[in-house]
Amino acid sequence: MSSSMCLARCSASLSAGNFPSRMFMGRLHAQRRTRTLQLRCAASLLPDQPTLAASSAISPVPSDLPEVLGDALHRLGAIYVLADASASTAAAAVMPTAVDSAAGAAPQRAGGWVAPVADALEQVLYALQEGLDKLHVPYSYGYSIILLTLIVKLLTYPLTKQQVESAMAVQALKPRIDLIKDRFGEDKDKIQKETSVLYEQAGVNPLAGCLPTLATIPIFIGLFSSLTNVANDGLLDTQGFYFVPSLAGPTTMAMRQSGLGTSWLWPLGPDGAPPIGWEDAAAYLTLPLLLVAVQYASSSVTSPPIDPKDENANTQRALLVFLPLMVGWFSLNVPAGLSLYYLANTVLSSAIQIYLKKLGGANVVMNELGPVTKPGSGRRNGVAAGEWSVWKPATVLTTAEAAKARAEAEEAVERAREAAEEAAAAAAFDNASVSLSVDDSTAAIAGTATMAVTAGAPAAAMDPSKVNRRCKRRRLTSLVQDGSTASAAVAGASA
């Protein structure tokens, strides 16, 4: 159906007192926007015609249309000025094939398995918008997008909670995993085996956190597709949101798919202004900038601390820096309604993560482990390799208890390291020997005995916190006895 036929049908319906349906008006808006884009792109490629520029003037409304339809088209004119500016400016900077592709790309609705989910969420969005309109809430479409995002987050909250609890359980075992890595060094097979045994004994599945995330992906794809359908149908063309002129601007999904999603922002004109002017550009840039700031704040609050010794530490830091920038760049290429959804989703996700991780909302279910023993030391006293000495029944740990368990595990790791230093000190004592050589010279014998008696001085000067007291006392007593024996030998030799 052509645009003129659509206008004639609307005129006849309005004259008869029948208002066109929301879906029909959406198709009308989408067809008119596509036709405007085609005409402007074609005109900009004519060699004898100057490049079209954005104008604040609104095209005159045909006088034979009813007053209601004329007012609607008048309010729709602003968004088409944005489309005109984007198309005319981009046409001078890109190849003709790209312009033809952008002009001929008609809005398409989601298909395949996404279609039922997108259609259902779209109907919920319509119901929310109509309900807000009845309550005379301003910016009803913007608030309906936020409410729909909130509903989806609440529906997926159990899956999010399960994912967070699994991640916290794995994080609580990290000190013990680090001890395993220190014990086996570069033997990755042994590390993997011991780590698997630890997960099994602790009752933790490290892959359990992936399943809830995968389950929520189709839902959010459907939500994104439903908002895309609304934008393609033109239902957001006249819907602003506070400082944002239109939730359908400043670009379209068709232009984004053709690589012209940011043509509203650059290239800059001769006066240094973007194609749509600094005033509108600044208004549309507010949402992407807010989104980047919220992403950075969320990452700094909810992300676990990065271990400098981790081999993936640099990759994790790079993701924390570049991921918000990538999301901000993507929001520049989509209508403002989708940017509003990204912002609402980020804020709600951050609030849920803070509640679960910082405020005790998550319960970590795992077997409480006893003191740390040497993993991988083989079977000793009935304890197999990789097992830990004390086991308790499965308990439910709150966030505070999980933090306490993590601190106790770190203390156990420190005690194990001190035990390793103690073992090294004991080995040093074992290597020390008292050697006596009876020579013809009495002075040489006396000097050898003196060296033997003073052989324990460095060991006695060691830090008491690093050497077990009982081991130290036993070793020093042995040295004193050896020294006494050496002195007696010297006295006998002298006699």
UniProtKB/Swiss-Prot annotation:
Stromal side: 97-206, 295-317, 463-495
Keyword terms: Chloroplast, Membrane, Plastid, Thylakoid, Transit peptide, Transmembrane, Transmembrane helix
Topology of the protein relative to the lipid bilayer: Multi-pass membrane protein
Membrane-spanning ranges: 76-96, 207-227, 274-294, 318-338, 442-462
Transit peptide listed as a keyword: yes
Function comment: Required for the insertion of some light-harvesting complexes (LHC) proteins into the chloroplast thylakoid membrane. Essential for the assembly and activity of LHC I and II. Its function is probably partly distinct from that of ALB3.2.
Subunit structure: Associates with the LHCII complex and with the psaE subunit of the LHCI complex.
Family per record: Belongs to the OXA1/ALB3/YidC (TC 2.A.9.2) family.
Official protein name in the record: Inner membrane ALBINO3-like protein 1, chloroplastic
